[in-house]
Amino acid sequence: MAITWRVTLLMLAGIVPVVLRPSASTAAVWILLVVVLTLVDVLLAPKPATLEISRIPLGGIRLGESTTSELTVRSPARSFRALVRDAWQPTAGAGHNRHRIRLGRGDSTRLRTPLQPRRRGDLRALGVTVRAYGPLGLGARQRTIPVEGSVRVLPTFESRKHLPSRLQRLRELDGRAAVRVRGQGTEFDSLREYVRGDDVRSIDWRTTARSRTVVVRTWQPERDRRVVLVLDTSRTSAGRIEGAGGGVPRLDSAMDAGLLLAAIASRAGDRIDFIAGDLRVRSRVRLAGQRDVTQRLQETMADLEPVIAEADWSNLAGAVAGLGRHRALVVLLTPLDPHAIEESLLPVLPVLTQHHRVVIASVRDPELEATATSRDTLEDV
């Protein structure tokens, strides 16, 4: 049950009869009259449960983007005048979610609520609150109707704007714009006849001896290599890098770097594996053979949040070993916290480097760099 501002106005209107006939009984009768009218109005108000409410499913969006929640409301039995609130959890950023409706019998309408999510993951609707007014507009029946709905918010992947230039650089390194010669990161491709200008070191003397012409080997960039991304979700990843809008969490910046690396590696024909964890492994995904690697990786990263605990690198190294003993490029996406590195990561590195090539990637904080390079006077301190 709810009352409206009209009840207050009706109470104030009681000043007139009290002035005309100043007595306590006059005031009591007026108050009783207002209460009775309000109760009758509430009883005559339609029941919110009679409304038919459905929600159009929402697709996934990236953090920073906006979307719209859309409700379809129909009144099958009688005319309806109500205030409808499409309630979402606070981080969904639901704005202008209160809608006034007036429906005739059998009429329907669509209510749109803009959403501007402020964090990753699955953000859910809390229900639809309907306040149905009586014919006098004094009172209303109110009820919250559960209408399921959610929106999946993926990592931003802001570095995708750098992807075209990085892919162009990759093509240059691959040898599509250069002579195919043997070197680190290449593998045998085919045999062909020698032409002037070829590197004599590429001559296949055994094949040349069996044929009447000089034959050289051609090389191509290695394919089907393994890249393992290991994302640290421990407490050190909860810190923020100063910037616009209050800064960006270190974890989100590491995700962005991992997505860019995965996109480039997949275009190069490499296999991508992903591990995320802290004290325990939170996620483990094998992305080999999948077309849209970045989309799958974003879906996996969406629910990851920093945990108030230190990273157990021995456990994470075991997860890497569980992917197979084939040599791989293992990229550790972790903040370079001296204590955490010394206590947990350094003892594990020899085990990883014994079978894999290891790269440690950390987010650079511009504010710390500016502080380190600044020279203050004694008065400034």
Language-model segments: what does each one mean?
Residues A311-S362:
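Exposed acidic/Ser/Thr-rich ligand/metal-binding surfaces
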Residues D292-A302, E367-V381:
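Acidic, Ser/Thr-rich peripheral helices and adjacent loops at domain boundaries
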Residues L33-R291, R327-L333, P347-V351:
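An amphipathic, basic-hydrophobic helix/alpha-beta surface used to engage anionic
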Residues S283-D312:
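Short, charged loop segments at secondary-structure junctions
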Residues M1-S54:
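Extracellular/lumenal glycan-associated context and N-glycosylation machinery
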Residues R280-V281, V363-L368:
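Short beta-alpha junction loops
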Residues R284-L287, E342-S344, A370-T373:
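Short, well-ordered secondary-structure micro-motifs
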Residues T236-S237, D337-I341, E367:
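Short acidic, S/G/P-rich loop/turn micro-motifs used as interaction or catalytic elements
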